[in-house]
Amino acid sequence: MRRFTTLLALLALSLVAVGGAVSAQRAAPVTSLTFCVDPTFPPMELTRSSGAIFGFDVDMAKAIAADWKISSKPVKTAFPGLIPALKSKKCEVVISGIFVTPDRLKQAGAVTYMHSHRVLLVRGGNPKKIAGPNDLKGKNVVVQAGTKYEEYLKGLKAKIGFSLQSYPGDTDAVAQVLIGRADVVLTQDTSAAYQIGQHPGKLQIAYLFPQQDSFGIYFRKSDTQLAAALREEVSTLKKNGTLAKLAAKYKLPVADVK
């Protein structure tokens, strides 16, 4: 009788173990974490000479995939096409230094993972003496196309008047300031910090906008299981210090990922 009871106990434990294994397998809401990304916004995402995409967002995607025991893969996509690509299922999520905004939330869901501020970036010494948005009047201003920065500048241009040119990537826009073709670029403090580090003495922040922006991971609204898993995972990566380590690695304010 005791032997029979012991066998039943072992059988029960084996079933629990199997059930646990199945649960672990089901913990990953997707089989592979494909993410649409525009690698023109360092240090969030950029491209090596080999063509490999890397940066804060790429490392974060890898960390998420590692916890889920699946692979991650970037899907290179032009910035204006990120949300459309998500909706057409070219990727499972968008992780690309993209703001969480009311307009985008009408099309997809999002999980916030970082906060930051917009800045006006100028040449070292600030030769045009730009101290705020109103000082853009009559200046040559550049920005990355398809961004909320561009949308904001178009509205401001209509009010005060200045030359505005848009470029495919943030790095392209910053380059115009470096070579003297533009007076100022509107970008994010994350990008500005990276560019200033890459070009010591040649660039500086002229103005930091007071309002806070939030970067988010976008997902299809119909993917409720993925949404729940992402919320839990981002919370975990914040609590265990993974995002803080990535912020330090890419010389970003650690407080932005708390």
Give the positions of each predicted feature.
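A ligand-binding cleft/hinge motif common to bilobed small-molecule-binding domains
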Residues: G81, G97-K106, K154-G155, Q176-Q211
